[in-house]
Design a protein with these regions (language model features):
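A ligand-binding cleft/hinge motif common to bilobed small-molecule-binding domains
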Residues: 38
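Short loop/turn microsegments at loop-to-beta-strand junctions
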Residues: 95-97
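Glyoxalase I/VOC metalloenzyme domain signal
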Residues: 1-34, 42-92, 101-111
Length: 111
């Protein structure tokens, strides 16, 4: 039997803030046992991996080598507007994809 992805972990400056953004973006909740040092978002109904956020002292210094690709449930423009209201920022618009950054500058795409 092959391995499966149990969780994805972000190093970050503020685990609660980043977990709050991604929980809202993905329709989930920040786990009640989360702390200022480590926060956790359980995968919502889509069954993907859980997401951990660990506080680290050093800042992000380069482009992510891995990122999320989100599928818009309705139109891309509507989803981008919703994510902007949560604190994300558009960095580039393509024909069928929008590149954004979350509240700590982590890149992700909306399709």
């Amino acid at each position: 039997m092959p391995s499966f992805i149990k969780s994805v972990t972000f190093d970050c400056a503020d685990p609660i803030a980043l977990a709050t953004f991604w929980a809202a973006a993905l329709g989930s909740n920040v786990d009640e046992d989360s702390t200022a040092e480590q926060a956790f978002v359980e995968a919502p109904g889509w069954g993907g991996p859980n997401i951990w956020f660990n506080k680290v002292p050093e800042p992000k210094t380069a482009k992510n080598r891995v990122h999320f690709d989100l599928r818009a449930p309705d139109t891309i423009d509507a989803e981008v507007a919703r994510l902007e209201a949560l604190g994300a920022t558009v960095t580039r618009r393509g024909e069928d994809i929008v590149v954004m950054i979350d509240v700590e500058g982590n890149e992700f795409c909306v399709e």
